[in-house]
Amino acid sequence: MGTALVYHEDMTATRLLWDDPECEIECPERLTAALDGLRQRGLEERCLCLSACEASEEELGLVHSPEYIALVQKTQTLDKEELHALSKQYNAVYFHPDTFHCARLAAGAALQLVDAVLTGAVHNGLALVRPPGHHSQRAAANGFCVFNNVALAAKHAKQKYGLQRILIVDWDVHHGQGIQYIFNDDPSVLYFSWHRYEHGSFWPFLPESDADAVGQGQGQGFTVNLPWNQVGMGNADYLAAFLHVLLPLAFEFDPELVLVSAGFDSAIGDPEGQMQATPECFAHLTQLLQVLAGGRICAVLEGGYHLESLAQSVCMMVQTLLGDPTPPLLGLMVPCQSALESIQSVQTAQTPYWTSLQQNVAPVLSSSTHSPEERSLRLLGESPTCAVAEDSLSPLLDQLCLRPAPPICTAVASTVPGAALCLPPGVLHQEGSVLREETEAWARLHKSRFQDEDLATLGKILCLLDGIMDGQIRNAIATTTALATAATLDVLIQRCLARRAQRVLCVALGQLDRPLDLADDGRILWLNIRGKDAAIQSMFHFSTPLPQTTGGFLSLILGLVLPLAYGFQPDMVLMALGPAHGLQNAQAALLAAMLRSPVGGRILAVVEEESIRLLARSLAQALHGETPPSLGPFSKATPEEIQALMFLKARLEARWKLLQVAAPPP
């Protein structure tokens, strides 16, 4: 399977026919700029390209009234003055003789994409469309939107395929109130929207855009609004919202399909959003969503009005859907005060409805939290006033670190025969090794732990590590004997440092003691998941128990491991599963899959050989980009699991700001 790109050049036909400063930014060049970007990067040719077809009137009727559909159809025969008069009856809308055709194509593209994904023709995809849709309501155009493309896609998925749980993620900078109204009382659709709000002073100026609008009737708790009350929100703020609000709810909801209202006016440089999130942030957000719903993601373009920023952001999303590694994130991973206040308001509003939030831990913030303005000065060299100047934005976009994908995605060096591991296709069996003399030199400090066969294995593992650091292999799995696991991990740490890795994240599970000579200089972040008690040796070395509940395990990953990993910004991740590691198949796969994002996939997983037959296939699939299996029914974290996380967060959040999930008391 692959990635679909649904498009039709006719969607560039509708355009503004009169002077209107509010509407002029929704122009045909938005589509052509995005498509040109995909072509220049060679991404279009890697997709399954589908030519959009018009949605039928019956399909439009899944959301819209017959009278409204007829009214839009009538615009095909109106002259300019009549179109202008009709447009003025709506808020921030213009009609054109080709609007009906274009809007039907946009809706049809969304439906085609759902069909392609749910029939298994592709794994995921993007519908590149205009006009956008998320503001459109049952009987009203609104905010450049004519038909509600994503709402239609959700209704179509429910009606045609019988889906019972659909997640809609709306990261457009405007509130998609049209989607909210349509599914306000529907518990089968979980709608998450973040949006510029500024305490109700930003368009569409609605009280129901605030955090306390949670849905009605049976739909209470299934509308999740995260209002941004300042401009300048950046990468760290968006990540914090995903890690501390969206993903906990999404895992508990367990969707069968993820729809993304992919508006890129929330990206840097956009005159509407005035936000600071750089294009590569959308690659990370996309990859974080790929662990849900079996990876079935249908993204539909919404807003985005700075052409260069829009094109770059679309490319970032598509290359992630295609399976390319995520590029590094720019900037400090420090959420601002206003973002944390918004996150706390959402958690407060949603806690009655979600077990995952009832177990949430919220340490008090330190006074060193940066404001958006302070971070803007560091990122752009000027404050985020109106439109960002080209001479500030273009150099920033040029900084995007687009590493080519390594020729080998996943490699394995194992003491167990390959046939016994049932590895997925495309995984390379590593036969190469570093020189014996070099291996012996690295193993000298642990001579008692390495037998002759262990040295041969270590040589292969060092060869894997070199391949990852040289950009020839994206990630790898290796096996060792139980006796040699800790020593192997220590050797790998030292070799990473010798090869001038700036930061190495070590996630060690089971009976693996921290190396005695492990430096505390900020180059190694050591997290040991073992035992019954949490402990802190320093701000870079600590341990925590392995939770036994699904809720506790998800809180460990989303509330501790990923915030630490993103805050540390490692060059390399070493994931070691030692004796008595305690991980089940699905847990190991999810941990590996989630750790790919912060490090661009550069992971070396070392597994003691007693566990490799059980874990090899699921680990390899996760590292290879396949969606990890479900953890099973959601179960609430125990008080002991919550206490362990609380202990660590309260002591670490002063250094690791992404652990913060709440604003200080008034």
Curated annotation (Swiss-Prot):
Coiled coil: none annotated. widely expressed. One of its GO terms (cellular component) is histone deacetylase complex. Residues 1-323 are annotated as: Histone deacetylase. SUPFAM superfamilies: Arginase/deacetylase. Keywords: Autophagy, Cytoplasm, DNA damage, DNA recombination, DNA repair, Hydrolase, Metal-binding, Nucleus, Phosphoprotein, Zinc. Its main location: cytoplasm. GO terms for biological process: DNA repair; homologous recombination; macroautophagy; negative regulation of transcription by RNA polymerase II; polyamine deacetylation; positive regulation of mismatch repair; spermidine deacetylation. InterPro entries: HDAC_PDAC, His_deacetylse, His_deacetylse_dom, His_deacetylse_dom_sf, Ureohydrolase_dom_sf. Disulfide bonds: none annotated. Its EC number is 3.5.1.48, 3.5.1.62. GO terms for molecular function: acetylputrescine deacetylase activity; acetylspermidine deacetylase activity; deacetylase activity; histone deacetylase activity; histone deacetylase binding; zinc ion binding. The active site is at H135. It holds the Pfam family Hist_deacetyl. It is found in: Cytoplasm; Nucleus. It catalyses: N(8)-acetylspermidine + H2O = spermidine + acetate; N-acetylputrescine + H2O = putrescine + acetate; N-acetylcadaverine + H2O = cadaverine + acetate; N(6)-acetyl-L-lysyl-[protein] + H2O = L-lysyl-[protein] + acetate. Interacts with HDAC3. Interacts with HDAC2 and NCOR2/SMRT. Interacts with HSPA8/HSC70. Interacts with MSH2. Belongs to the histone deacetylase family. HD type 2 subfamily. Polyamine deacetylase (PDAC), which acts preferentially on N(8)-acetylspermidine, and also on acetylcadaverine and acetylputrescine. Exhibits attenuated catalytic activity toward N(1),N(8)-diacetylspermidine and very low activity, if any, toward N(1)-acetylspermidine. Histone deacetylase activity has been observed in vitro. Has also been shown to be involved in MSH2 deacetylation. The physiological relevance of protein/histone deacetylase activity is unclear and could be very weak. This is Polyamine deacetylase HDAC10. It comes from Mus musculus (Mouse). The gene is Hdac10.
